[in-house]
Amino acid sequence: MTVLIHVLGSDIPHHNHTVLRFFNDTLASTNEHAREFMVAGEDNGFTESCPALSLRFYGSKKALAQAVIAKAKANRRQRFFFHGQFNTSLWLALLSGGIKPAQFYWHIWGADLYEASSGLKFRFFYPIRRIAQGRVGGVFATRGDLSYFARQHPGVRGELLYFPTRMDPSLNSLAIECQRAGKLTILVGNSGDRSNEHITALRAVHQQFGDTVNVVVPMGYPANNQAYIDEVRQEGLALFSAENLQILSEKMEFDAYLALLRQCDLGYFIFARQQGIGTLCLLIQANIPCVLNRDNPFWQDMAEQHLPVLFTTDDLSERVVREAQRQLASVDKSGITFFSPNYLQPWHNALRIAAGEAE
């Protein structure tokens, strides 16, 4: 039997760390197809913190791709599970036959599916990538992303799968200690990445609420982002008074981030694609509604779970927000498909499919 190899093809520290810890802590002990990893980037202590995994690290995306292609050619029975796929060389290998479709299974992370960049090199590459995506052996994704993908590639198998958000199920039934009232606190974006379109989002929040709300913008991740943080702060202060604007430029530990989220009344996410599911889950768990772009297909996942969805095109007010909070509080969180531990069984199914052990 050939053991499935998992590929983290781009150096995205936060997401890669989440995936590796999830596999180490939850899947590896009971499934031999959950232990082998090829990772773009440095070790950064992963080998020590994830002893249940066999990890190989590569200094660049190109070096990793070359190693994957060599393994694929050496053994055509070898299958790979790509977690997110931000590696140009791997898409090209799928097109050229270096990796065969039956060897290539892909968990869509959102940004690797959508064609959001206006850069010339991206506009040139997107059509090529789109053709390659139609040749994969199968995809795993959110309901919304599966729907989006199926419109382009109806012949490719798709299975429901959610990113393994770190969650404490015991908090699902956490009682609201006091009735929410007073000035709203709005979380804008889920990180400091430009894909959050912070400036556009701040303008939209100001247009809806004026300078009457507290605005919190978490920008501690990614690192080396000070110039963009300063740009967002400058624009924010042109819209909101200093006491109503909080730009968080330092990376936060999970418990501190969780505490921050629970101080908010509303999450505002203007990006037009699926991303930030972890933050969305933690907000929903705390009965905090989220505003989504109508072009963000994750609203389909929320609607499927009977969760209230607010859109950036809605007329928002404190009354609307409080009503959404009330509706969220009435939902049985233990049944939400994309919450822990409910997302575990689809992961076991995905491993069997990618390994060729399930029809």
Curated annotation (Swiss-Prot):
Lineage: superkingdom: Bacteria
GO biological process: enterobacterial common antigen biosynthetic process; fucosylation
Lipid bilayer topology: Peripheral membrane protein
GO cellular component: plasma membrane
Any one GO molecular-function label of the UniProt entry: 4-acetamido-4,6-dideoxy-D-galactose transferase activity
Keywords: Cell inner membrane, Cell membrane, Glycosyltransferase, Membrane, Transferase
Enzyme class: transferase
Cellular localization per UniProt: Cell inner membrane
Pathway stated in the Swiss-Prot or TrEMBL entry: Bacterial outer membrane biogenesis; enterobacterial common antigen biosynthesis
Catalytic activity: beta-D-ManNAcA-(1->4)-alpha-D-GlcNAc-di-trans,octa-cis-undecaprenyl diphosphate + dTDP-4-acetamido-4,6-dideoxy-alpha-D-galactose = alpha-D-FucNAc4-(1->4)-beta-D-ManNAcA-(1->4)-D-GlcNAc-undecaprenyl diphosphate + dTDP + H(+)
This enzyme's EC code(s): 2.4.1.325
Role according to the record: Catalyzes the synthesis of Und-PP-GlcNAc-ManNAcA-Fuc4NAc (Lipid III), the third lipid-linked intermediate involved in ECA synthesis.
UniProt similarity note: Belongs to the glycosyltransferase 56 family.
Name by which UniProt lists this protein: TDP-N-acetylfucosamine:lipid II N-acetylfucosaminyltransferase
